[in-house]
Amino acid sequence: MPSSTVRFYFDYISSNAYLAWTQLPALAARYGATIDPVPVLFAGLLEAHGQLGPAEIPAKSLWMAKNNARKAAVLSVPLNPPAFHPFNPLLALRASSLALEPAARNALIGALFEAVWVRALHVSEPAVLERIGDEVGVGGAALVAQAQQPEAKASLRRQTDDAIARGVFGVPSMLVGDELFWGYDDFPYVELALAGRDPLDAAQWRQWSGASWPSAMRRRVRPDNAKL
């Protein structure tokens, strides 16, 4: 039976996560699914898996900015350059990890994404977080105070560690049942999973998952005509 929950791993530093968040409620509603938003620290995922972030690779950063501008235009979703990038998302992520009522928490998450990617506000600043908290009716001053407590810090750390243990390596990532999907571009496959029509062939996948290509060997073996 298809899963009725989409676990959504995100970090405000990702414009793809913002685009995904604008579309996820409608997608979930089509299948009567609930959304379980899980803030994680993208930098923690990168470190755990030995990766560089897109912003650390200039060619990739430029390509992704252009690619996301195209996606936003097709979706008719506003997308503007952030005030700073990369930036420290910890305070906003910790605030989003607090035990708020689900509707209020979703409103806060949406407002924080919009603050970064539409309004060019610097969500690393407590005053900005307080303002946004007031705008969505969750009490900005209390929100900032709670987000700075050890419990909020521990929650974000635990969520990030759990995501890593589940194989999450980037944001946004969506978990439907036991299947992990990565990036806004995977939404068609998320939808198929929610509909109970995942096209992945189990027998074929067993062949792929049983294959072994040590990374050290891949780095040593190059085509004869490769130029170093």
Give residue ranges: language-model regions:
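Structural alpha/beta surface segment adjacent to cysteine/selenocysteine redox centers
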Residues: Y12, Y18-R119, Q204-A226
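C-terminal cap of thioredoxin/glutaredoxin-like
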Residues: V6-R7, I13-G32, A111-L228
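Extreme N-terminus of proteins, especially the signal/transit-peptide cleavage junction
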Residues: M1-S4
